[in-house]
A protein has these predicted regions:
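A contiguous, well-structured pocket-lining segment that forms one wall/lid of small-molecule binding clefts
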Residues: 193-195, 459-489, 493-497, 613-793, ...
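Glycine-rich phosphate-binding/hydrolytic loop that grips phosphoryl groups
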Residues: 537-559, 563-565, 604-610, 773, ...
């Protein structure tokens, strides 16, 4: 065997190339210290591809160094590749950190932003420390990363910190190998670093920038860097709404215990019912309002610090949160004692109207830590934007917040990339993300195999895009709903940033079938010749497969609001047999009309009435109308409202057919009187879930037709058995798959039973419990039949409907009890935020197939 290093005059040398997340996480200082410990000389440097090391010394010391390096690497690093080769000793007298080597064609992984570490937090409150109450304290273990990086390699001159030259004290730390700020690129202090200011808009607006168009209320200075934060806390205590510039953009903040200001914020933000997130000073304060399991505490306090959905704690009659709802189901035993809270500390229930769960987070920057400490109460901390617009990140955009904010807590560190807060929960002891953004992106998802460079443009709602290089899928941060120019511009800018950062020139473009999606139009306007249309629900399942590292065929259960089908109709309750190349539709929910199209989504009473009529005729129409009237909130429904729905269905005018499971929940919830009109996506279904206990009895349904897919049973090689999709039609013929009509889940028995229960006086929660159990029952029924026909026993569940904890838990439980392996949601959102990952995989695999490279 050849030696793993070169030996000259008794000295050995080795060259190491390390790829992965190895910049911005203290990797070079770690290598330096490790080399010192093993008495080695040489050097370490950043490159455009990662970190390069040359180490020389006694052969045994070199070997020990190489062995220890991956084992002891910094906790926030991630080594994706570690290459070792021999080298000639250079005779270096010391070990040094060299300047970066820039290769314009190379790329590397980039660290997401990291929440403030314990050491920096301790300094923040130590009056003897020179960073006492400094809002931008950070070190190699924490602080801003991706949101300040403008290019790679990761050096200060290629970040937004370049405009803040280091003072002598910070420079000494930066150059001291024994200091934890050794080569910490965002390093700063009150003397040389960014400063915070509290301002109000003057008459004439903020368009003149931070030096004009504003009234100065307080300014941070070297001897009192946190003065504006104390003044801001006083405004919050007085009931004002503040725009607070944070890590990846602005938050809108107010006192979460003041119902008047909470209502005012919701009104100004045009968000009357959707829940707001709350930031707590610490776990003790949080425990006074929520029940928290140990797994949830771990997620809250993780380096990512996401918003975590937690069940309310009973805070007594005066502060009760929805007396009908009570506390939500907890995730295991609570961790730690309940915190104390006097009456003034009770969070206003309208923060999360009608919800069992509160979106809670802990402060993750020094600025937030200081603000929460000064405020002395929990603060609403919601995205700094108007409803459906991207988050504001800079002063040049702050005019958009003028209708909402009374004052602005700002700073002069620029934000390179706009990032919203991530949102997650814990189910089954595992973190599950609903929104993947700060703290998680741009860390890549590993692909089962390398793919051609691919851009996947994502969905219309909850958009994120995805770019691939090698076996890395860079799923972007949450972009938002692509329904206005501002969000589209944010989307286009973010795509360009990722392409630049990861040195990408996509060869393949994946996009949704829906011709009117802005993401689809963006894709079709791109110059690339190789474009792949990917069916929405197939993309959902493909995302689950990629996250779980699977290529083989599975049973895919994809249920959501709406997605464009191969037949041009609106799908949303689908069961596939599929892999990463293609799929076959084997069952779906019965097609039913949406009277008024989009109006039926905004006014779910229309769906309730239309489906009752379509399924049960005149009798169903009359019974549904009486229920809707008897349980109606404002506005009261008139005879003409019902007549219009009937005419639309009879004539087939503006009543597109859909198989949507999301609309099924809407219809039943509206019949049960939960809500007849919505102000945000999925509202009525979410509120039905909140009222529904576990353990309901299934309603009847009918499964019409046989699941006959034996002829397309999986064979060796990804995609060799798939049919259905037009893009794979020729290949389907090669596989010998015969066309069979999918089975249909008929809903007339369910609607008849629901109407009967409601007429007998059943509560909405009881009916909701039955509906959840019914969906779990027919999912199991169909999966059993597919297993019997194909032998497949792995089920991938995806789609926005599975954000519903009660439904997801129910489906996973019955499937697991019947011997199925379930690929459930994880750190890739189960909703449309994960669609781009699936699109990227399907488009990339399709490209490999076309090239004859898919083995």
């Amino acid at each position: 065997m050849s030696p793993s290093h070169s030996i000259t005059s008794g000295r050995a040398a080795v060259r190491l190339s390390v790829r992965g997340v190895v910049q911005g996480v203290g990797f070079r200082p770690f290598v330096y210290s490790l080399a010192q410990r093993h008495a080695l000389t040489g050097w370490v440097r950043n490159t455009s591809a990662g970190v390069e090391i040359l180490a020389e010394g006694a052969p045994a010391d070199v070997d020990a160094f190489v062995e220890a390096l991956p084992r002891e690497a910094p906790p926030r690093s991630h080594i994706a590749a570690f290459e070792r080769s021999g080298a000639e000793p250079e005779g270096a007298m010391a070990f040094r950190i060299l300047g970066s080597a820039v290769d314009p064609d190379a790329y590397q992984l980039v660290s997401p932003d990291i929440a403030t570490c314990d050491d920096c937090r301790a300094e923040l409150f130590d009056p003897r420390d020179r960073r006492y109450q400094y809002p931008f304290t950070n070190c190699t273990n924490c602080g801003p990363r991706f949101t300040i990086i403008e290019d790679l390699p990761y050096d200060r001159e290629r970040t937004t910190m370049r405009r803040f030259p280091l003072c002598p004290a910070c420079r000494a730390e930066y150059e001291d190998p024994t200091d934890r700020r050794f080569h910490a690129e965002p390093n700063a202090c009150p003397v040389c670093g960014p400063r915070v200011r509290l301002v109000r808009r003057a008459e004439g607006g903020a368009e003149d920038g931070p030096g004009g168009g504003v009234v100065e209320l307080a300014e941070g200075k070297p001897d009192d860097p946190a003065a504006p934060i104390g003044a801001a806390a006083e405004l919050l205590r007085r009931g004002e709404i503040l725009a607070v510039k944070g890590l990846g953009g602005f938050h809108l903040a107010c006192d979460a215990t003041d119902g008047d200001v909470v209502d005012r914020l919701k009104e100004r933000k045009r968000r009357p019912h959707k829940a707001l997130a709350v930031m707590f000073a610490d776990l003790e304060q949080l425990r006074a309002h929520c029940r928290v399991s140990c797994a949830e505490e771990e997620l809250l306090a993780s380096p990512e610090h996401p918003i975590v959905l937690l069940p309310w704690r009973d805070v007594g009659p005066d502060g009760a949160v929805g007396p009908e709802l009570g506390g939500g189901a907890g995730e295991g035993e609570t961790c730690g004692p309940a915190g104390g809270a006097g009456p003034a500390a009770v969070i206003d229930p309208e923060v999360a109207t009608g919800q069992r769960y509160l979106g809670a987070m802990l402060p993750y920057t020094p600025l937030h830590i200081l603000l929460l400490r000064e405020a002395g109460r929990p603060l609403v901390m919601t995205s700094g934007n108007l409803a459906e617009e991207p988050i504001v990140k800079g002063w040049e955009e702050i005019e958009r917040l003028a209708p909402i904010a009374d004052a602005y807590l700002v700073h002069d560190r620029e934000i390179a990339v706009c990032y919203d807060d991530s949102v997650g929960l814990v189910r089954g002891g595992r973190p599950r993300l609903i929104r993947r953004s700060r703290g998680y992106a741009p860390f890549p998802v590993a692909l089962p195999r390398p793919l051609p460079q691919t851009l996947a443009c994502g969905a219309e709602l909850k958009n994120a895009f995805c770019l691939t290089r090698d076996a890395n899928a860079f799923l972007s941060q949450h972009i938002g709903d692509l329904e206005n120019l501002e969000t589209l511009e944010h989307y286009e800018t973010s795509v360009a940033v990722y392409e630049k950062m990861f040195r990408l020139e996509p060869e393949v473009v994946g996009y949704d079938l829906h011709p009117e999606y802005l993401a689809t139009k963006f894709a079709l306007a791109l110059p690339q010749d190789e474009k792949v249309a990917v069916q929405h629900h197939h993309a959902h399942i493909a995302a689950r497969l990629v996250e779980c590292g699977r290529e083989d065929a599975v049973i895919g259960v994809s249920m959501d609001g709406l997605g464009y089908g191969d037949d041009g109709r609106l799908w949303g309750g689908e069961v596939f047999v599929c892999d990463l190349l293609g799929y076959r539709r084997v069952a779906y929910l019965e097609e039913l009309p949406l009277p008024g199209g989009a109006a039926a989504i905004e006014k779910p009473w229309r769906t309730a009435l239309g489906w009752s009529y379509a399924l049960l005729g005149e009798d169903g129409l009359g019974r549904a109308a009486r229920l809707l009237r008897s349980r109606a909130a404002a506005p009261v429904l008139a005879d003409e409202d019902f007549a219009v729905v009937r005419r639309q269905i009879d004539a087939g005018l503006n009543a597109p057919l859909t198989t949507s499971c999301g609309r099924l929940f809407d219809a039943v919830a509206a019949l049960a009187g939960v809500r007849h009109e919505i102000t945000y996506e999925g509202q009525v279904a979410i509120e039905l879930e909140m009222r529904s206990p576990a353990g309901g009895e299934p309603y009847p349904y009918a499964l019409e037709g046989e699941v006959e897919v034996a002829a397309c049973a999986p064979r060796r090689g990804a995609g060799e058995w798939v049919a259905a999709h037009a893009a794979h039609a020729a290949h389907a013929g090669e596989a010998g798959a015969r066309e069979t009509a999918p089975a249909v889940i008929r809903l007339a028995p369910l609607f008849a039973a629901v109407l009967g229960d409601l007429e007998a006086g059943a509560a909405a929660g009881a009916v909701g419990a039955g509906l959840h159990a019914t969906v779990a029952a027919f999912v199991l029924d169909v999966c059993r039949r597919v297993r019997a026909a194909t032998g497949l026993s792995v089920v991938a569940m995806a789609g926005g409907v599975f954000q519903n904890r009660l439904l997801a838990d129910g489906c996973e439980a019955v499937l697991a009890a019947d011997g199925f392996e379930v690929l459930a949601a994880g750190l890739v959102p189960v909703n449309d935020g994960g669609v781009a990952l699936g699109q990227a995989a399907v488009a990339g695999y399709t490209s490999l197939k076309r090239r004859g490279e898919l083995g």
